[in-house]
Amino acid sequence: MGGLNQGGSEVLLMRQGTIQRATIGGYFQLRLSSPYSVPLFNPRDYLTKPHEYNQYIQDNIDLLCGDAMLELQSNAISTLANNQIPGTNTWVAIINWLNDFIQPIEKDYDMVFLDANPSFSMYTQIAIATSTKMVLPVMADDSSRRAIQNAFSLVYGLKLPSEIYSKYAFAEKLKEVDMPLPKVYMILKNRLTQYMGAASAYATVLQEIDKDVLSLLKTYTDMFAFKTLDMGIID
């Protein structure tokens, strides 16, 4: 869109100011008034052609812009997902919002990329439930190691602190309605580590991440789209 130095912020504000608010927040705003049934809408009203604002981006790429308004919508979305309505699985209806958006236009695209917040908010769950594959980026620090561990707990329900949580786990809810979980497709080590020596403490952390992933790969092979570490971990 142009980035910080090329007017990207102004372009985003302009897209947010359209009648339909051409962002993910604009689409979710539409769904807040029709959370459990798909309203009549045209997904393309919410899409942006980045090439029109940045000539270096290919013209075959469409973008559904991000929106800080998601944070304001988050509580409302969670409340709607937890409502108890006879004959309606409210959680599934909400979790399919992005599927509802993509379905009318999916034949026009070869691939859809979803950039999700690292938190496990309801809108992140919507993105994950829509995905078939996950790419997990990591930095060379302990917080990234914990983040990988948390991702497997939150998404796949592994190593939960108590069986009490299993009933409410994301993976269990998808399983109940026969919705598949995305597979871990790739783990990307941040390129900043290229300047760090192999003997550094940073390298040790990355090696520990490798060990954690290898252990999971051996035990839960069906959760991964790769069979060996060198196929799935990118330095």
Walk through the language-model features, giving the residues of each:
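P-loop NTP-binding core
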Residues: 1-235
